[in-house]
Amino acid sequence: MLVEVLLNTPAQLSLPLYLPDDETFASFYPGENPSLLAAIQSAVHQPHGSYIYFWSREGGGRSHLLHAACAELSQQGEAVGYVPLDKRAYFIPEVLEGMEQLALVCIDNIECIAGDEQWEMAMFNLYNRIVETGRTRLLITGDRPPRQLNLGLPDLASRLDWGQIYKLQPLSDDEKLQALQLRAKLRGFELPEDVGRFLLKRLDREMRTLFMTLDQLDRASITAQRKLTIPFVKEILSL
């Protein structure tokens, strides 16, 4: 999926961002987060602006939900923007200029700009412009609540503390298994429970790692024309 973010630099450049095709609302397993999922879906489908901030220490689905929101609106022909601030070395703060004209703006990993005066001011100004226009949905993620971000600009921390704020609750091991099985089902194959529990026991339990491993096993299964079993998984993953 291609999402184009406008960079209002003197050269009027545009920056294409490729987001995962499989990170949609349908593939998100909510676990104990149905209220957050419902709030984001509601915001996406409302014709007016809104602001939601959600955070978690572990990551665990923050980017997935932003990607899903972008996918939902971009498929409807709306202009959306996704800015991963953990990769801000590839951007300039001016990337945020003009984003209040978009239907949706997603800011990922805002904790990464703490202490960066230029980025903090650019984010503060964008927030104010979005509030003034009243048309743009704004979704922001962080690794902690807004007041704990150690931002150098107190007014930005104050702004981020307005609106709807959620903690993204981590999945239990049983929920991670169900999330893996859901992802497998959407990709057209079955993940047996014993294989899923084996993966949870032997691998890093971080969901992105688990999903990447699931993709690897899917490809290997197709190539070898074999179903997923524990012996086959051990062979492919050298466990």
Curated annotation (Swiss-Prot):
Q: Which UniProt keywords apply?
A: DNA replication, DNA replication inhibitor
GO biological process assignments:
DNA replication; DNA replication initiation; negative regulation of DNA-templated DNA replication initiation
Q: Which InterPro entries match?
A: Chromosome_initiator_DnaA-like (IPR020591), DnaA_dom (IPR013317), Hda (IPR017788), Hda_Enterobact (IPR022864), Hda_lid (IPR055199), P-loop_NTPase (IPR027417)
Instruction: Name the domain of life this protein comes from.
Output: Bacteria
Signal sequence range? none
Functional description taken from the UniProt entry:
Mediates the interaction of DNA replication initiator protein DnaA with DNA polymerase subunit beta sliding clamp (dnaN). Stimulates hydrolysis of ATP-DnaA to ADP-DnaA, rendering DnaA inactive for reinitiation, a process called regulatory inhibition of DnaA or RIDA.
Per the record, the similarity remark reads:
Belongs to the DnaA family. HdA subfamily.
Could you give the subunit structure recorded for this chain? The active form seems to be an ADP-bound monomer. Forms the RIDA complex (regulatory inactivation of DnaA) of ATP-DnaA, ADP-Hda and the DNA-loaded beta sliding clamp (dnaN).
The protein's name: DnaA regulatory inactivator Hda
Q: What is the primary gene name for this protein?
A: hda
